[in-house]
A protein has these predicted regions:
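A short C-terminal boundary segment appended to hydrolase-like catalytic domains
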Residues: 262-279
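Active-site catalytic loop in hydrolytic enzyme cores
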Residues: 57, 90-181, 194-203, 270-273
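CN hydrolase (nitrilase-like) catalytic-core segments centered on the catalytic cysteine
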Residues: 59-80, 160, 166-255
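Short, acidic/polar
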Residues: 16-27, 170-176
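Short beta-strand scaffold segments in enzyme catalytic cores
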Residues: 81-83, 104-108, 147-149, 235-237, ...
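Short Pro/Gly-enriched beta-strand edge/turn motifs at strand-loop
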Residues: 79-89, 126-134, 216-220
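Active-site-proximal beta-strand elements of phosphoester/diester hydrolases
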Residues: 1-12, 37, 105, 118, ...
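Cys-nucleophile CN-hydrolase/nitrilase-fold catalytic domain and related Cys-dependent amidase chemistry
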Residues: 14, 23-112, 118-120, 193-208, ...
Length: 279
């Protein structure tokens, strides 16, 4: 199955970002991609964390979700909409802080344009090294459930796909849960900072692939954004042996590779580590 990890340098204008995403998805489909995965915050990287609140959508309704559905249907490919801000279902009685935050949601659309899976980012990033400060909990609520979906590909294999987002990558127990569910492909749409990405991005992606003997698709934001934030980029596809099948360092682009299920089966046969676990 050909998979595309879409790298973007998203701006603070949703319409501009959707046009860029549409162009990149068209390029991926033209190159034969069956699944295309957009990065975290593909639709908006605003000037303030709270800018997300202004473009939030109710699940199942809104122009960003309509764009994803229409594009999947038009190109007849599977599309994972990195993340978009989705309104939470917290009751009116909840505290004001909860009611003023949204979920960072990854949605999967089938080639028919149906939304077939939803994952809300579970782990919220916080970082402070004295020069850079980030705290996603100011504008986001955490998700609560791991999510997998089934993707019947043209190669005849029915892929089990585990969903995650960015900071989730640092929590291997999530991916162990996916491994136990039979996942052979792990998705990690991200917007790693330059600082943390330079230190840990490739290391963590390859580790998740090797320890779970699974493919990893990791689209990323990669460049200097309008808000002054520098993201690390290096979108990549990693095979179950930890080899990088394709990668792009920075700037927008389509990172494409053929994921061969026979390669995964061979790796698991040669090194049946998943069967040797004792804990």
């Amino acid at each position: 199955m050909k998979v595309a990890a879409i790298q973007m340098v998203s701006s603070a204008q949703v319409e501009v970002n959707l046009r860029s995403a549409g162009r990149l998805l068209e390029a991926a489909a033209a190159d034969g991609a069956e699944l295309a995965v957009l990065p975290e915050y593909f639709c908006l990287l605003g000037h303030r964390d709270t800018d997300k609140l202004q473009v939030q959508e109710a699940f199942g309704d809104g122009p960003i979700q309509q764009f994803l559905a229409d594009t999947a249907r038009r190109l007849h490919i599977w599309i994972v909409g990195g993340t978009l801000p989705v309104s939470s279902d917290v009751p009116d009685s909840a505290d004001a802080a909860s009611r003023s935050r949204v979920l960072n949601t990854s949605l999967v659309f089938s080639p028919g344009g149906q939304c077939v899976a939803r994952y809300d980012k579970m782990h919220l990033f916080r970082f402070d090294n004295g020069r850079e400060q980030y705290d996603e909990s100011r504008a986001l609520l955490p998700g609560a459930q791991p999510v997998t979906f089934e993707l019947p590909s043209r190669d005849g294999h029915r892929w089990t796909v585990g969903m995650s987002v960015c900071y989730d990558l640092r929590f291997p127990e999530l991916y162990r849960r996916y491994s136990a569910a039979g996942a052979d492909l792990l998705l990690v749409p991200s917007a790693f900072t330059y600082t943390t990405g330079q230190a840990h991005w490739e290391l963590l992606l390859r580790a998740r692939a090797v320890e779970n003997l699974a493919f990893v698709a990791a689209p990323a934001q990669g460049g200097l954004h309008e808000n002054g934030r520098q993201t690390w980029g290096h979108s990549m596809l990693v095979d179950p042996w930890g080899r990088i099948a394709a990668e792009q360092a920075e700037g927008e682009g389509v990172v494409l590779a053929e994921l061969d299920i026979a390669r995964l089966r061979e790796a698991r046969l040669q090194l049946p580590a998943l069967e040797h676990r004792v804990l």
